[in-house]
Amino acid sequence: KYYDKDPHRNIVMGTTFDAVVEKSDFDLIRDWAKNRGIYDGGDVKTQYMKLAEEFGETGKAILNNDMPEIIDGIGDMVVVLTNLAELAGTSIEECISAAYKEIALRKGKMINGTFVKDE
């Protein structure tokens, strides 16, 4: 932990330092995957198939209105997407950032519960 004699600077720098040092959930997922050989023995195609499996399980949970399984399914998909991105030579953070930049200023409207972008 960062410590400075000036309490104001200590709060700001301590928070900033902690944010830099603390591993993100994505970092923890990558460490978990590395330790299990997913990046050495896996590939994009197998991770894509795993994503399809998790997608189906999440769909079933949604249809059954099973909130614990919905949470589990979404989390599982994020884990798989993190690994898929890594195996594709990018990062989940880069993918999320690129997607947000694309949609940030998008205009559209809600139709039948889905946002439809203007053409």
Question: Model-found features: residue ranges?
Answer:
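Flexible "arm" and connector segments at domain edges
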Residues: 2-74, 78-119
